């Protein structure tokens, strides 16, 4: 028996996906040359490995999708802050994402976000993003990731808030009724000097990276706990390596994640590995400014905020729960 999670969509089908097979070692020995021949390649290595026994492969693919939800919601919140608070156009925001893709944030999702924000709708002449209905659908894997985390008692707060954000976007009637209520609260572009605007954009970049690290830390924590409960032997460094190509969340910093697990630096949490600990501490003040200012501006940032709250919960010597 083999259950294989496959990521990459249409492009992966054509150019090679990231594959996460689960099942017996004997089955893997038979299928390995076939899977390695069709998988995507990253730095010359095939993006496929035997994940573990039974349903381990599909479980890891499920968590991959949960992380993807969080990743995309963080990008959306970054866009929303620049659009609503700073009054930037989609094309201007696309330029920002292009620059961010030259930094530690380099990833497929940042790249395609920049591309989409530069697109213009041919029929209306408006930015394409402005003619897309703001109701996000779900296929279920993000929900399953959260449900499984609840069963395992593992907090995946960023992923959960990303799922709920999609759920709220789909509550069309409720949202329409809320607009009629004309609730009190801040709205509109925030007057800001150019140098302050530039500084805030940099704060958003820092907050995005810190929150992204938390999303991956939470996802890998869920995989770790599931491996204990279901008696799977999962090589987390190998999982990070096969996500470097072919899949939706492929990103530059997956090399850092792989190294952290390989070196034993992330055995308890990815956040404790020296590189990621330093990155979080470097971004911490920017992260707090983004969340606090978003609240002041009346702009929802559920994944930014929940990721910061998770970090603060971890570092608290005593919790009131």
PLM features per residue range, with description:
Residues 128-215:
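A conserved active-site cap/scaffold subdomain adjacent to cofactor or substrate pockets
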Residues 281, 286-321:
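C-terminal amphipathic alpha-helical interaction region
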Residues 82-94, 149-154, 229-232:
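Inter-helical turn/loop segments and adjacent helix faces that build the functional surface
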Residues 1-95, 102-127, 131, 169-195:
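Rossmann-fold dinucleotide-binding core
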Residues 1-2, 156, 301:
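Hydrophobic beta-strand scaffold residues
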Residues 252-291:
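Generic long, charged, amphipathic alpha-helical segments
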Residues 99, 103, 227-262:
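Small-residue-rich helix-loop
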Residues 63-70, 96, 113, 132, ...:
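Short alpha-helical scaffolding segments that buttress acidic/His motifs in well-ordered protein cores
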């Amino acid at each position: 028996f083999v259950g294989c999670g496959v990521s990459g969509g249409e492009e992966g089908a054509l150019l090679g996906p990231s594959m996460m097979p689960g099942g017996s070692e004997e089955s893997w020995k038979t299928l390995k040359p076939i899977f390695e021949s069709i998988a995507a390649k990253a730095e010359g290595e095939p993006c496929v490995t035997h994940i573990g026994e039974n349903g381990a492969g599909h479980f890891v693919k499920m968590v991959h999708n949960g992380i993807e939800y969080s990743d995309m919601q963080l990008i959306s919140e970054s866009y929303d802050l620049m659009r609503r608070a700073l009054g930037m156009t989609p094309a201007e925001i696309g330029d920002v994402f292009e620059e961010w893709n030259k930094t530690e944030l380099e990833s497929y999702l940042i790249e395609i976000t920049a591309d989409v924000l530069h697109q213009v709708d041919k029929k209306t002449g408006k930015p394409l993003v402005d003619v897309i209905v703001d109701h996000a659908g779900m296929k279920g894997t993000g929900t399953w990731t959260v449900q499984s985390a609840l069963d395992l008692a593992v907090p995946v707060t960023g992923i959960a808030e990303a799922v709920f954000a999609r759920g709220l976007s789909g509550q069309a009637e409720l949202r329409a009724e809320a607009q009629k209520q004309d609730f009190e609260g801040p709205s509109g572009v925030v007057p800001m000097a150019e140098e302050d605007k530039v500084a805030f954009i940099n704060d958003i970049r820092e907050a995005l990276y810190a929150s992204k690290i938390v999303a991956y830390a939470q996802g890998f924590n869920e995989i770790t706990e599931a491996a204990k409960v279901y008696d799977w032997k999962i090589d987390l460094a190998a999982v990070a390596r096969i996500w470097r190509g072919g899949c939706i969340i492929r990103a530059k910093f997956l090399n850092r994640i792989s190294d952290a697990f390989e070196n034993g630096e992330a055995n308890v949490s990815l956040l404790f590995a020296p590189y990621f600990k330093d990155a979080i501490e470097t971004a911490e003040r920017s992260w707090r400014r983004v969340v606090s200012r978003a609240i002041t501006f009346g702009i929802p940032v559920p994944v930014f905020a929940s990721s910061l709250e998770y970090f603060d919960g971890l570092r608290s010597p005593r919790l009131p729960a």
